[in-house]
Amino acid sequence: MGIDAGTTATPRTLAEKVWDDHVVVSGGANEPDLIYIDLHLVHEVTSPQAFDGLRLAGRPVRRPDLTLATEDHNVPTIDIDKPIADPVSRTQVETLRRNCAEFGVRLYPMGDAEQGIVHVVGPQLGLTQPGMTVVCGDSHTSTHGAFGALAMGIGTSEVEHVLATQTLPLRPFKTMAVNVDGELPAGVTAKDIILALIAKIGTGGGQGHVIEYRGSAIESLSMEGRMTVCNMSIEAGARAGMIAPDDTTYEFLRDRPHAPKGAQWDAAMRYWQQLRTDPGAVFDTEVYLDAASLSPFVTWGTNPGQGVPLAAAVPDPELMTDDAERQAAEKALAYMDLRPGTPMRDIAVDAVFVGSCTNGRIEDLRVVADVLRGRKVAPGVRMLVVPGSMRVRAQAEAEGLGEVFTAAGAEWRQAGCSMCLGMNPDQLAPGERCAATSNRNFEGRQGKGGRTHLVSPAVAAATAVRGTLSAPADLD
């Protein structure tokens, strides 16, 4: 990787700088560039065929030291000392363990102190660093862009290519600037920013782009908040999301297990501090959000772009002028069993899920505990609080958060993807409605027939207490 990210004569965006520093072979105008990959993250769902391909070709993993695996999607979040009940899930986890042992890849298995969701584990260990290229066979790899890394999800054939070569053929992406300036009102969070953005530009608004999030409201976010924003870039159709590193980034990384130390830290800092979009650099697209105008946000439909402020009502498809939008809304409302004009705050839930690679970090759990402290989960509501990693769980326990959750009547679980997706035992029953801090509200995402409303941790906690979609201010 070069050290001249800020010294070129032509103004460049942050994404262009990281890209240029990783071009092994330029493809010119007609072919993809060959891009070097600094960190490859692996889990049990998208890797089995990739390892099989290596085995059939007689190839090793080229850089096992730059590869990390963890078990997250299929693992249960209770009784983790017992065999996994579902045979498909059990096979995938056992296959990952065999593959990692055979190919010399680091693995954090279920029960390990460092196990957790891959996009929580990488940053907390200091493996994710500014200026890196990061890939994983998982859509939400964009999370790591919060550190100024170029991070993206890839398919299984690409996973095999990276395992074998530590490179990936890619064509340059378009660039989009999302400018969020102003001060966020009290109770408005990073999750509300990204849900509002997706509602504004649509689930295809960022297609083919790398989004750079900029502006005073973004700069004021913690690293956890920045990861939440970048995590859902894919829900806006983008290939990746990035935020330029700054003092908040450096303080988060300092003294992490795999962060540079001593003179290496000083050298890294000199490079990292150049990772900013140059004055005069041109983005293909620019979008603006006024932070002061934002409020707690919630989805009503079956894609992340179908969202409104919590203070609003379920929209009426008949008032939509675009035919495709109207038809999608009608279909979504039928699945969600909602009526136009219903105030969002009147919608009752059966379950609340706190967790996922979007909102399963310690800051998220602190927010939830602050709301739940001294209160009880509403009768008839099931609440799952699932830490994004065992390290997050240990920290939450040390801070007494686990006791707050259980005292309120919530289920305090072990680490994993859990109810974000129907690949493990934590699922909704058909017809159940859930307020979830995760990232996708597709039909059946949390279990066949389940209905999902995407919310922030603060809204999730307040909803659990009131039993209807609510913000903490509604509890006063």
Swiss-Prot record:
Biological processes, Gene Ontology terms: L-leucine biosynthetic process
Keyword Acetylation: no
Family listed: Belongs to the aconitase/IPM isomerase family. LeuC type 1 subfamily.
Subunit structure: Heterodimer of LeuC and LeuD.
Enzyme class: lyase
HAMAP family membership: LeuC_type1
Pfam family for this entry, one: Aconitase
Sites where the protein binds [4Fe-4S] cluster: C357, C417, C420
A molecular function GO annotation: metal ion binding
Catalyses which reaction(s): (2R,3S)-3-isopropylmalate = (2S)-2-isopropylmalate
Cofactor binding remark: Binds 1 [4Fe-4S] cluster per subunit.
Protein name per UniProt: 3-isopropylmalate dehydratase large subunit
Biological pathway: Amino-acid biosynthesis; L-leucine biosynthesis; L-leucine from 3-methyl-2-oxobutanoate: step 2/4
Reported cofactor(s): [4Fe-4S] cluster
Gene3D superfamilies recorded: Aconitase, domain 3
Listed EC numbers: 4.2.1.33
Role description: Catalyzes the isomerization between 2-isopropylmalate and 3-isopropylmalate, via the formation of 2-isopropylmaleate.
Keywords for the protein's UniProt record, in alphabetical order: 4Fe-4S, Amino-acid biosynthesis, Branched-chain amino acid biosynthesis, Iron, Iron-sulfur, Leucine biosynthesis, Lyase, Metal-binding
